[in-house]
Each structure stands twice: as C-alpha cells, then as structure tokens.
Swiss-Prot record:
Component of the acetyl coenzyme A carboxylase (ACC) complex. Biotin carboxylase (BC) catalyzes the carboxylation of biotin on its carrier protein (BCCP) and then the CO(2) group is transferred by the transcarboxylase to acetyl-CoA to form malonyl-CoA. SUPFAM superfamilies: ClpP/crotonase. The lineage of its organism: Bacteria, Pseudomonadati, Chlorobiota, Chlorobiia, Chlorobiales. The gene is accD. It comes from Prosthecochloris aestuarii (strain DSM 271 / SK 413). Its main location: cytoplasm. The keyword Transferase applies. This is Acetyl-coenzyme A carboxylase carboxyl transferase subunit beta. Its cofactor is Zn(2+).
Amino acid sequence: MVWFKRAKPSIFTKDKRDMPEGLWWKCESCGAMLHKKQVEDHFYTCCECGYHFRLSPYQYFSLLFDEKKYDEFDDNLRAADPLHFSDTRKYPDRVHDILEKTGKTEACRNAIGRVSGHDLVISAMDFGFIGGSMGSVVGEKISRAVSKSIEHNAPLLIISQSGGARMMEGAFSLMQMAKTSARLSQLSARGIPYISLMTNPTMGGTSASYAMLGDINISEPKALIGFAGPRVIRDTIKRDLPEGFQRAEFLLEHGFLDCIVHRRDLKHRLSQILGHLSS
C-alpha cells in the first residue's frame, strides 16, 4: 500500500560533472586545501604556511630565465645498465615505465639562458625520476654543464633535489661524486662563479659532493639537507636529534649555508648575486 505519492516529477539533473584532476592541491605541511591557480600565483608555495612544493627542471627554467626563454642541451643522454641490476624489477624496466608514465628520461636537465640580462647555465635535478638519484648520466650532464659554463664564460647554477646516489648503478654512481667535484674545481680555477641551490630534499651523495661546493650556497626554506636521513642517524646513535636538525634553517645557523631564499624572491636574489659577481 502506497501512503504517499509524488505530486511533481523528480528534479531533473544533468549528468554528473567530474572535477578535473589536479585542480586542488593539499599542502603536505599544514594540510590546507589550495586551488591550483592559487598555488601557481604563489610560485608553487602554500599561501597558508609557506611550504614549497617540488618543481620540475622546466618549471625552474620558466621561473628564472628571462621571458621563459632558454636553450636546453644534452637532452639525448640515457641511462645504461652496466651492472645488469635487478631487485624487485630490472633497472631498464623501471626506467622504461617512468618514461612511459611521465615522459622523463633522466634526473637532470641542462639549459642556458639569461637572468636579468646575465648569461647563466642551469643544471636542475628532477625528483620525479627515481627520486632525483645521481647516476652516471646525471654526473655526465653536470660535467657538460661545467663545459658549457667555461665555453660561454657564464656562471653555473645547480639546483639540487635528490635522495642521493642511484643504487642501481653501484660504484658507477659513487664515481660521479668525484667526477662532478673535480669538474667544478675547473670553474674555480677559471674564476667562473658556481651557485648551488639546495631544495627539499638534498641528501646522500648529492650533498656530499657538488651540492655543498658552491661559491655561494643557498636553499629554499625548510629544505631537508644532509647525508644520512634523521631516522637513520637517530637509530644509529640512540639519541634524539636537535629540533630542526638537517633543515635549511639549522644549517644556516651553523654556517653551512649563505642564505635561505623564498621562491618568490629567488630570481631577484639571483639577479643581485650575478650583478655583484659580474662587477
């Protein structure tokens, strides 16, 4: 028995609209929900707490180079598999899948352009490719970036964003620490400035080699910078670590960094540095 009857037909609704993927971003620090446009307008930082989201090399190039114009070079280098490494998966299969999903070919990109009228070579790491790990291709690209700086007598900026050496390449990866350090010494011998920008994270063999060798070492706020991770150190020494240990602010206080620069001020600060160095 029906007690109630609908006096009017049901309200007509259009087909459900799917929200575009990536329209809202969640801050990993404070948990705030941020609209994509809002994040972009704040240079990919959280407008609530200042957290810096990770950028790709191309995003850094667009942020820093005048009129977003630059020339990428040595983008044809690909990782080899000299050790025939395999853990849960074969190394070449892992690289192939990343290429298929993201289009990324390596953990480093090189470009040359102008920043406020000053020539600058930038070598930028990409955390989206195996955690920005340093393998033989990364070492070679940094080496070629040094060569480009020498060729054009232009300062070099390396943007570090890496978990360290790439375990799949074993000793070949560790060799890049010495290789990049030796090549950077050639810049110093010629009086060509090298600026190191450390972002979150800059760890392992990266921090133990080229990342800490800058004539000027700068960092984004609250970046994790160190060799072994805080948890590993804590478990090894069986002691609690100082508050903020291995964060950029702690390193600045203890003399490891020259300055910490918010991303919105990064190009302006680089322009100042390049202006002082060129004069």
